[in-house]
Amino acid sequence: MVISGERAYIYAKICGIIGKSFVGKRVSALGGINRLAELDRIVFPNANRDLPERELLPDLERRTAEKIVREIIGIIKCFKEPPEFLILLIRAYEYADMKAVLSALADRETMSPSWTDIGEFRTVNFEAYPNIEKMLKGTEFEFLLKEDMTDTLSLQTKLDRRYYGAVWNAVLKLPRGDRKGIEKIIGDEISLRNAAWVLRLRTYYNMKPEKIKNMLIFIEGKKTFTDDSLEALNFALDVRSEWTKWKWAAFVREGNIGEYWKIDPRYFQNQASAFLYRSVYHSFKTRPFTLDSVFCFVRLKQSEEDVITSIAEGFGFNITARESLTLLGAI
């Protein structure tokens, strides 16, 4: 494979960032932390935030997100012509922020929810909240203005479908040599999101199968990524043996003899996230100089954000850093 100077420079740059990030073996360094202030000092050694913990938590989460977004954008800007796929990765933050806006509007909140600044890649005028027409004018999100703004769950599903549909189509436009790992990981990610959603809706909301089907991320084409989740609609939630031959059975909690068993959506979600993390880390190590490695860099940084946030929020529930990492499957 002929490696361009641009690709070599970008790969060297992302390796330098990853080497200083809390991913891979460095995640375990967070396990011995006991206090939020200590976590803040490790993540931001040059910062001196003398804040009460209830103020430090949102402050730490905000700075963590801002730092990681800056690093991701810095890499994307290294491309003379960034692929559409990479731009969509950073715009995931905008989609997530739009979900928060829709929830806030449905609850008639007058103050805007916090949002992540993705710089030149941002399209929504979040400063105009709560004027939704002004916020969305000229953006791809204008279609929301014709929807029932009170049906938050349906709107969020439409956003998920729109986002992952755009991502998948952008992946298929990449050269085959660049997308080997991306295609597999994104496909698994969509499939697992659907599966986790089915488990949550069945377990926590007792939602009927026909309604659940309308809440899944369905992508037009040869691969719909709904087969596994549709199959899970038919399994009894309290019979472990019915799940044994399911594609994602390894992520379903085992039961003990004589113990009442029921599907655990949170356990499934954590196991699925750990599986995707391992896939991303392996691909990052084995696919240097490809867009695969850049994609994996983005996912590793986003995983780092999730880990830091989970540990920080866990302290508020008397959950230790090590316990949080164990729940996430990070150690």
What are these regions (language model features)?
Residues 1-331:
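N-terminal domain-start signal
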